[in-house]
Regions:
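Post-transcriptional modification and biogenesis factors for structured RNAs
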Residues: 1-167
Length: 167
């Protein structure tokens, strides 16, 4: 496995998307497509709720899988040891900071939890409080769709860098 520590590759700002124990193949397929179109690296943390060769994952990711830098890791610690993120953000409905108030840097890593339960409290507690992010929603709503949440955060980070490498 190659170590992905480079924060800028071929004129692109590289961000890392980490899906902690994702459960729903179409969401991950959509995020594969998002990664291919934004240049973000995608990391899946086991156990996965599906087989990465599953038909619904392939269908949602279309032909973008070949254009995506995606790796599957046995646990978050191994992932972090390999990508060596300068900063990581826990994205959760229990976040303390709005995602749009942060100045993002190349190499930032965004960690999202499984669709049915979100990130474990213990993992959120490991993250510095100012890096526990949330996406605003109307009161009494439970959560946003995982692939939508990833798109909102990644595109805000890339926007702050003037969509470098994009067209």
């Amino acid at each position: 496995m190659s170590t992905l520590t480079t924060s800028e590759v071929s004129g692109f700002i590289v961000f890392h998307i980490v899906l902690f124990e994702p459960e729903i193949p179409p969401n991950t397929g959509n995020i594969i497509r998002l990664s291919a179109n934004s240049g973000a690296r995608l990391h899946l943390i086991e156990p996965l709720g599906f087989d990465v060769s599953e038909k619904s994952l392939r269908r949602a990711g279309l032909d973008y899988r070949q254009l995506t830098h995606m790796q599957v890791w046995p646990n978050l610690q191994t992932c972090f040891e390999n990508i060596q993120p300068p900063r990581w953000f826990a994205i959760s409905t229990r976040g303390t900071q709005r995602y749009d108030t942060v100045q993002y840097q190349a190499g930032d890593t965004f960690v999202f939890g499984p669709e049915t339960r979100g990130l474990p409290k213990a993992l959120i507690d490991e993250c510095p409080e100012v890096q526990r992010l949330r996406i605003p929603m109307l009161p009494d709503n439970r959560s946003l769709n995982l692939s939508n949440s990833v798109a909102v955060v990644v595109y805000e980070a890339w926007r702050q860098h003037r969509f470098i490498g994009g067209q």
